[in-house]
Amino acid sequence: MLKKLDSLLTVAGITLPDQQKHQLIGYVELLDKWNKAYNLTSVRDPQQMLVRHILDSIVVNPHLQGSRFIDVGTGPGLPGIPLAIVRPDAHFTLLDSLGKRVRFLRQVQHELGLNNIEPVQSRVEAFTSEPPFDGVISRAFASLQDMLSWCHHLPAKPEGRFYALKGVRPDDELAVLPEDIVLESVIKLDVPELDGERHLIILKSN
């Protein structure tokens, strides 16, 4: 699996220290093991997890600004855990409403020694944080409107950002953004061996 990860990283132009590579593989191994009982992801093949979960998450890293992030609707820790592994200088709160997912996240935290994550079981609308976050990250929401309405209280004003991971560029959604939200950028992400498009939408309060 290390060989596969190395080849994907090379194609993506990403260089990581060995410790981070081993943590990423350790995460895939835990996800594969727990998935059989907990049904955490529809991706069953660990080699595919490297593409669709690991690379798909860490390509976002260069575009994140700040040091305190929350991954909303993180599920089994995506994109939060891969990002936390490659950004040990930043802190990631991993929010999910399902207890079995949060139990898995705590196990990952323990086994991989990740001191920069905090798994939290909560519904997003009931969760508050002081101080607020530099960035709100999610690939879980069906629409940008849902993300903005559920998470409006989480980023610091005015400099905090929303980072939405989407497939095809959501032009219909971008055309109807609320008046108090400004589109900062739409970034086409290149994920090696991934079928379909990936875009990162970065939004700010104005």
UniProtKB/Swiss-Prot annotation:
Key words, A-Z: Cytoplasm, Methyltransferase, rRNA processing, S-adenosyl-L-methionine, Transferase
Pfam families, A to Z: GidB (PF02527)
Localization: Cytoplasm
Enzyme class: transferase
Plastid is among the record's keywords: no
Chemical reaction(s) catalysed: guanosine(527) in 16S rRNA + S-adenosyl-L-methionine = N(7)-methylguanosine(527) in 16S rRNA + S-adenosyl-L-homocysteine
UniProt keyword Cytoplasm present: yes
Protein purpose: Specifically methylates the N7 position of guanine in position 527 of 16S rRNA.
Family the UniProt entry places it in: Belongs to the methyltransferase superfamily. RNA methyltransferase RsmG family.
Stated name of the protein: Ribosomal RNA small subunit methyltransferase G
Species of origin: Yersinia pestis
Lineage: Bacteria, Pseudomonadati, Pseudomonadota, Gammaproteobacteria, Enterobacterales
